[in-house]
Curated annotation (Swiss-Prot):
This is D-galactonate dehydratase. Catalyzes the dehydration of D-galactonate to 2-keto-3-deoxy-D-galactonate. The lineage of its organism: Bacteria, Pseudomonadati, Pseudomonadota, Gammaproteobacteria, Enterobacterales. The record marks 310 as: Transition state stabilizer. It comes from the Bacteria.
């Protein structure tokens, strides 16, 4: 079998799919994207395509190594996201050839179901509480929400109180009937992260995500030493080599590699194994589309340390398309009691509505993340 063609489709809301075709008619789908940089990743995919056309898609490990090691400069969000989507599609092809789901090819199930959590938007406590109530009505009991708005390097007590007040009202409204993680989104400086984490401790969030930027990872063990709240990080780390340094330093309780950013299934399964050796949980980052989610689920179901799975149904970013709008077999993604079951169809287990993909790709938006500024006019972290 040989790879004959690679096609990319930029899609709403902020996704990109790729299709790898073979000379035997078997097709694989992947989802390579950096949100806000889809065109750049698309160019990288097609640069890799110059080598991949004519190659045997079954040699996933070799093709991965060529893409990663074949150039003098390597790594980073663009290259690793391009590799990630290609890798997903190659696994999809292999599963279809062997008539088995990807998790079966990776050694089989270690669990029967995986807990999902849902994003909750809203700028005011009442909006967040209302959103949680609606999601509880469809079976969710675990959530993630923004821990704060933009915050200065050294901010005032009003900003701290506003963040804490939201969390306090949520805990008061629901008690311990729900669990929620707080995403600092890397928008908090190390000094302010210390303050916020201390103030939030009484409300027992499930985790604090990206308390500081990945560039400031040396603060993870320092922050962890002052709190009982688990620290989660990893969505802006792109290879096992970056995760290696974080694991060796300690402090992070949950790793969150993104299957569409960190080298795909091949790389993230290795990252999961490294995390297990350090007694660190796995919770793949996934605010993206259905192919990315499917890839995450296959890794979850073969990784003993997977604890829960993010998914983007109803997320506030999804303007122009929802998670399953491009999927024919929507029923396979149904959750029971807030849990995903294994995907059972061959390959990734996602049947893509190609006609709809082609149609909506004709006018795909060029999504960009917002640009925030502080009161003094300087740029703030989004």
């Amino acid at each position: 079998m040989k790879i004959t063609n690679i096609t990319t489709y930029r899609l709403p809301p902020r996704w990109m799919f790729l299709k790898i075709e073979t000379d035997e008619g078997i097709v694989g789908w992947g989802e390579p994207v950096i949100e806000g940089r889809a065109r750049t990743v698309e160019a990288a995919v097609h640069e890799f395509g110059d080598y991949l056309i004519g190659q045997d898609p079954a040699r996933i490990n070799d093709l991965w190594q060529v893409m990663y090691r074949g150039g003098f400069y390597r790594g980073g969000p663009i290259m690793m996201s391009a590799i990630a989507g290609i890798d997903q599609a190659l696994w999809d092809i292999k599963g279809k050839v062997l008539n088995a789901p990807v998790w079966q090819l990776m050694g089989g199930l270690v669990r029967d179901k995986i807990k999902a959590y849902s994003w909750v938007g809203g700028d005011r406590p009442a909006e967040v509480i209302d959103g949680i109530k609606k999601l509880r009505g469809i079976g969710f009991d675990t959530f993630k929400l923004n821990g704060c708005e933009e915050m200065g390097i050294i901010d005032n007590s009003r900003a701290v109180d506003a963040a804490v007040n939201t969390v306090a009202q949520i805990r008061e409204a629901f008690g311990n009937e729900i669990e929620f993680g707080l995403d600092f989104h890397g928008r908090v400086s190390a000094p302010m992260a210390k303050v916020l984490i201390k103030e939030l401790e009484p409300y027992r969030p499930l985790f604090i995500e990206e308390p500081v930027l990945a560039e400031q990872a040396e603060y993870y063990p320092r922050l962890a030493a002052q709190t009982h709240i688990p620290i989660a990080a990893g969505e802006r780390m792109f290879s096992r080599f970056e995760f290696k340094r974080v694991l060796e330093a300690g402090g992070v309780a949950i790793l969150q590699p993104d299957l569409s950013h960190a080298g795909g299934i091949t790389e993230c399964y290795k990252i999961a194994g490294m995390a297990e050796a350090y007694d660190v949980g796995l919770a793949p980052h996934c605010p993206l589309g259905p192919i990315a989610l499917a890839a995450c689920l296959h890794v979850d179901f073969v990784s003993h340390n997977a604890v829960f799975q993010e998914q983007s149904m109803g997320i506030h970013y999804n303007k122009g398309a929802e998670l399953l709008d491009f999927v024919k077999n929507k029923e396979d993604f149904n959750m029971e009691g807030g849990f995903f079951k294994p995907l059972m169809k061959p390959g990734l287990g996602v049947e893509i509505d190609e006609a709809r993909v082609i149609e909506l790709s004709k006018n795909a938006p060029d999504w960009r993340n917002p640009l925030w500024r502080y009161e003094d006019g300087s740029v703030a972290e989004w």
